[in-house]
Design a protein with these regions (language model features):
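Predominantly a Rossmann-like dinucleotide-binding segment in NAD(P)-dependent oxidoreductases
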Residues: 118, 125-224
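C-terminal helical cap and adjacent loop that interface with cofactors, partners, or active-site loops
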Residues: 254, 258-261, 268, 283-313
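N-terminal Rossmann-like dinucleotide-binding module
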Residues: 1-48
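Acidic-histidine catalytic/liganding microenvironments
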Residues: 25, 48, 63-64, 128, ...
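Contiguous beta-strand/loop segments that form the cofactor/metal-binding neighborhood of enzyme cores
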Residues: 190-281
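Hydrophobic residues in well-ordered beta-strands that form the structural core
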Residues: 54, 94, 119-121, 244, ...
């Protein structure tokens, strides 16, 4: 296989995470990186042996030896940088969420389609052991007729910056576009829509909240203006319904895991239990399907992100 040469735009927290995965993919080489922070760019590029470094991502896009770029920037920058990359004749792998608004997301998709370029959004939950097994069970008819899905995940205290981790850029609308729903919710919603067969949406309602106390100094210094809690209800044209609960902070114990309800059985997924799929009332077929799907590589922490990258490549 010919060597695939790519560039990475943004070497912050997410960019470093992606670079760690790239070194394990044979036939791939990161030849260029771009970031406004030149000191950090130099440090990261030296660590990963990236020869070409740019403070202006447009210079990176001028390289004709790069076939694809990985966009690892703040949410509201995804659209302009992705579209610029597509216009520069590059395929794009972009960190989630796709964009800060539906309008921007649609512009990205239209640019990719009109240019016949691949646009892949990092949604690692679509590649987990739980998702693959659940999809197998659903497609086999083991759970019967689907009628409801639950997309949920919340932390007792896990607000970026104000609760002690991450930067303030996660909690500023002008940079991140949204809070828990954009940061965590996209993973669970994408997973649920996939399991339900990507149904046509009829109506969506929802509400966002910012109710819990936080350190006043951190609130002031961060400019915190996004939601910590979001809830929604989705009606589909075929009668399916989905409820959504996402929270960075809530006065309940931490919990994460979506569920699917059918006329013959139900499936609950919990990624923090390392590929233990909870299945109720499905019987022998379900047990056999789960056992058949298990593989040592699937159990590795971060394997879902690796599969997402490999899928793009």
């Amino acid at each position: 296989m010919d060597e695939v040469r790519i560039g990475i735009i943004g070497v912050g927290q997410i960019g470093k995470n992606h670079l760690k995965r790239y070194v394990d993919i044979p036939g791939l080489r990161v030849v260029a990186a771009a970031d406004l922070d030149e000191a950090e760019l130099t440090r990261v590029a030296d660590e990963y042996g990236i020869e070409h470094r740019y403070s202006d991502f447009r210079k990176l896009l001028e390289r004709d030896d790069i076939v694809a770029v990985d966009v690892c920037l703040h949410n509201n920058l995804h659209a302009p940088v992705t579209i610029a990359a597509i216009n520069a004749d590059k395929h794009v792998y972009c960190e989630k969420p796709i964009a800060g608004s539906y309008r921007d997301a649609l512009s990205m998709v239209e640019a990719a389609r009109s240019s016949n370029k691949m646009l892949h959004i990092q949604l690692a939950t679509l590649y987990t052991m739980e998702t693959k097994t659940a999809k197998h069970l659903i497609d086999s008819g083991a759970v019967g007729r689907l009628y409801h899905g639950r997309s949920t995940g919340f932390r007792r205290r896990g607000r970026p910056f104000v609760d002690g981790y991450g930067t303030a850029n996660f909690v500023k609308k002008k940079v991140a576009a949204g809070g828990a729903l954009f940061d965590m919710g996209v993973y669970h919603i994408a997973q649920m829509l996939y399991l339900l067969g990507v149904p046509n949406i009829e109506r969506v309602s929802g509400k966002i909240y910012q109710e819990l106390a936080m350190d006043p100094e951190r609130r002031a210094s961060s400019g915190y203006d996004v939601e910590e809690f979001a809830t929604g209800f989705v009606r589909c044209t075929d009668g399916l319904t989905v409820d959504i609960i996402e929270a960075w902070a809530v006065n309940l114990n931490q919990f994460e895991g979506s569920s699917v309800m059918g006329s013959e059985g139900g499936i609950r997924l919990d990624p923090f239990e390392l590929s233990k799929l909870h299945v109720a009332d499905i019987g022998r077929r379900a047990v056999e399907a789960i056992r058949a799907a298990y593989d040592a590589r699937e159990q590795e922490l971060g394997a879902d992100r690796m599969r997402a990258l490999e899928r793009f490549l």
